[in-house]
């Protein structure tokens, strides 16, 4: 076969193989009562339309259109895999409590992150989830308060004080990274943290890339950064292990030491490599979600002067009970009730997570439909947040709707998941957010440089310009002890 004739043949083969696979899938599951819907064009399916909706911030409408057409359960094809879309409170309860649905990540994320809680199931998942919940439970978070307080103050002094304008999104991402690096890895200011910061940014950018390991591609750069991060973290973990064996540290000092202590007690059997992988997931999750929340809180306050004033009053009331430069405590954070209601309304109206992917590890039935083993589930968990059946006037920004959270129907407000799948880092994120806002609102007023700036989802909400703001320094009153 000549070169000239082989090229059309290869193109024809490339077109036919996906079509044949598509036909095989249809025949294989002909006896199943599959949900309504269409798998779309082979391989591509509805992937492009979903990505376009995320990028244009019309994902909610994209999902609503499918629900109106097919109902709250429908089949489609996303990222090359047959997929079932689930939405609504009943779906939230079903997905969060179903052990036969495990998290699915892209091939790029699996290669970059490794063997973590995102890819485990069964007994291993229970062990890791239990350990993470233990490390991030409120009693433990109280022990990290001083580190958080120090990191926030240092960050503001270095990056905000003396500046007339700042771009919020990248600064807040770095703040979230520094806090987690200090608390999780025990790494304060220094060259190790700086090296990790640069590599981590590269790795995060590669998580949604095409997983083709060719030099100079985004994925290749991310993979190399991931290897360097692992090398550094493995050494940190071994140093922590040595310090623990010599009695120089305790389980509350950092995540590595905590996990090593649990392993010595037989609570889990994770290797150092496994612990490193889960530490990377903790870093990525906290880095993204907390930074999104703080960024959009700052954006909200620029647009809502009345809310800004109420938050400032609450934070000044807390400051009155403290001495000069006295760090915040858990009790202080617990008193920031109005500030957290505003944060919850941000999470409702601009949810960091629109939806997530899971894989059925066995045949599952939901509402009379079959979800075959190996199929993906795209769980549009936050679509209930903007549903008028559960939230009156859902487009209106109104923190008072959280005055009595018991009035919100179960599984309708799920920014941190729910049931057995509740995010273990929700208290950590809450504390980090409130500490940051305490010091920001007491020291500054701000306004948006571009009032028309929108945001897109890549896949998390991100201001198009990074949220540049003009700063006005405010001298907070000084109080002694009340």
What are these regions, as identified by a protein language model?
Residues 2-5, 12-18, 35, 67, ...:
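Cytochrome P450 proximal C-terminal region
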Residues 289-312, 427-443:
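Cytochrome P450 catalytic-core helices
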Residues 2-114, 118-123, 127, 142, ...:
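N-terminal membrane-proximal hinge/A-helix region immediately C-terminal to the signal-anchor transmembrane segment
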